[in-house]
Amino acid sequence: MYRPRLLGQNLRGFTLARTCRRTYITDADVESARRYCLTQLQNSDYDAHLIRRFVPSPVQDTYAALRTLNLELVRLPELVSNPTIGSFRMKFWQESIDNTFAGRPPREPICILLHKGLQDLEARDGNSTKKSIKFWISRLIKTREKHMTNRPFANLASLEEYAENTYSTLMYTTLASLPLRSMHVDHLASHIGKACGIATILRGIPVLAAPPPPVNTPSGQVPAVREPALLLPLDAMAEAGVKEEEVFRQGPNAPGLQDAVFQVATRANDHLITAREMLKRLKAGEDPGHEFEHQGEAEHFYTEGSDTLREIRQGFGVLLEAIPSAQYLQRLEQADFNPFAVKTAGWKLPWSIWQALSKERI
């Protein structure tokens, strides 16, 4: 999960010439790209930095590239002064992904490492899921572009849609890279990703609602261009009587804030509870208890006669995304749903991830 921090890393890919293309990538290029992506995750998305170690080794490079791409897209609102520039940068990333899938990755660390992951996938299993992977990445980019302005969500349903199209989509992409095409595992990923996306919005409140610090660029520090923002759904804010300006001025003392946060956090927790119950039922040989709402959409097409237990074991490392979100929601509850008072996970998070993997429990 993206940990909201205003670390102003430059968008390296955007500063590179778009005309720079080559089809041959050396081992040194891949190693340099891997170091870059891992450093980004360690500094700015520690949850993903930990989980990467537990996803199946054949997709660890792809996972690192995907999560670093997500970081770059999340950072864009901090670095652009108007929507037009933001759209140009999003277009750059889409073109870079298109070229990477065409075998012409630009000299950009994320694309180089993703290209390596795609080559490894082709060597393992051909191109059976390559189309799906490209679809999911493109959906991530389009969704990030749509939400670049940091406007509040209209309601909880629109927040869930955002979470499905970002964090669930990242999980679908990783699963397709194994490759694993499983309705039940995708169904679990959908609920977990929704919980992750909602929890990320809550985690971002103390950062986005505060005046932004300067952004680091290759030329030095520059003033951040964004205004303070509060992304809580408007219906939850209205029900709790929360006003944006009061949150910007008063922070945790803003009237109704904790009530609104409680309502949103409850929805995230509901998705985790649903995923846990589903996992228990599936491991017991039962049906999941409810239908997958996205079955038949986009790339959600599956074959009959699959081995559910084998698929769960194969994809369980990806489902570990649930653990950081679950721990955050627990700490949020301990702080009486004051997002400004949530403590860090510390040493408990890596231990909890390892335990979850060992026991196959989320």
Descriptions of predicted regions:
Residues 2-8, 20-119, 137-140, 163-172, ...:
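Catalytic cores of Mg2+-dependent Asp-rich isoprenoid enzymes
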Residues 15:
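Short, surface-exposed polybasic-aromatic patches that bind anionic ligands, especially phosphate groups
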Residues 123-132, 136-139, 148:
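Fungal eukaryote-biased detector of long internal structured cores
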Residues 129, 155-159, 180-190:
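Short pre-active-site segment immediately N-terminal to the catalytic Zn-binding motif
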Residues 145-156:
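Acidic/His metal-coordination segments adjacent to aromatic residues that form catalytic metal sites
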Residues 197-201, 328-330:
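Transmembrane alpha-helical segments that form the membrane-embedded catalytic/substrate-channel core
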